[in-house]
Amino acid sequence: MNEEQLLKRKIIDTDNQAFNHNIYTYTNFLSINELSSVNKMSNELSFIPYDEWGGNPVCERKIIRFGSEELYGYDAGYPISTIRISPLSVKFAEQLNHRDYLGAIMNLGIERELVGDIIIKVPDAYVYCLSHIADYICDNLDSIKHTHIRCTICTDEIEAIKPELEEIRIIAASKRIDAVVASLTRLSRSNSNELFTSKKIFLNGICTENKSQNLKKDDVLVIRGHGKYIFIGDEAETRKGRSYLTLMQYK
């Protein structure tokens, strides 16, 4: 059984638990590619609704929750905690990167699927994780490389990592997704096409290699390594027949 088949089995089992026991059920954190695979499985799942959440709207790694308030009469939320990691002495702290933080956490014996996105806002970092391991991380993680740190579970919304939406306008050859991607990334059409073949383009949660489809209002476009956008629409044409397009970009 390959990894994709194993993932499908886990998803179907989690879906069936929600269906058979009338309770919310959750996956562990899934990568953006795994989430894409799940979003293609609608014909293999029960009628139980599901949604995704990673801690904030721009997270790539998310858990899936089966069930809804409409179905069960209550909202169980998501078992995700946010941990702030801060150096004990900012003056003597090293410049730590994503790999440093993730490596230190996994060295505690924690599996990757229990940890979501890590957002670095120097001098701090914020780690999304499943709630049942948050205390363990805080109790056991006291240094990263040569930097002594403290961990705190955040109970309120953190303004420092709250995403903002900014309206942007671009000029593209058309509303075709390849034209929009080329304009957003400032790459040539041929170079931007490599993003499709390397499976870095996601439209409404599904990895796509179809370069010819037109974007529609409220489509959510993710370009890995470049950003996340909501397509608003086209406004007018230039004298040369190119399109003015409006999108909202997560900052």
What kind of region is each of these model predictions?
Residues I171-K217:
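A basic, amphipathic helix-loop patch mediating RNA/tRNA/ribosome contacts
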Residues D219-V220, Y229:
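Short histidine
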